[in-house]
Structures are given as structure tokens and as C-alpha cells.
């Protein structure tokens, strides 16, 4: 058996973020969607205020923007990807145990 996964971007009109496909012998066996919800401006402001200068610079670079809202979106996008990847690893680990 061959187990793998794919994480691909989702269209913005569907909520953005990522789509996870869990594959067994290249056939989809499951998966999920990991949207980005950065609509809470207060949460974004709290996040920005908690970042140190290095973190702010990093996320502004990742966003290719000088706007804190774009940095927050880049952060949320990275978090959604990490969640998708974590789910994929859990699935892969469960296949190895079977």
C-alpha cells in the first residue's frame, strides 16, 4: 500500500485556505478543508500587538505587504496549512499502525 497526501490552495470565494486529500494508492480516501477566517479585526489587532518586531517583520515579509491586516492573513494561512499537515501526518501514522 502507498499512502500520501496533497494540500492544495482553495479559491478565495470558497473561504480560501487549503484542501487536504488523503490518498491510498493515489485514490482519495478522505480529507478536509482548512479555511482561513481572518474576518475578526479585533483578533487580528490583538495578534499584531502581541507580536514582537521580529515576528512583525517576518509576517509582513510573508504577506509581501506593509499592512498588519495582510500580515495577519499570512499568519492565518500558515496556521491553516499547519493544521492540514498535522491532520495528514496523523492519518499517515494511523496507516502505519494498521
Give a label for each model feature.
Residues 2-98:
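Alpha-helical propensity feature that highlights long, continuous alpha-helices across diverse contexts
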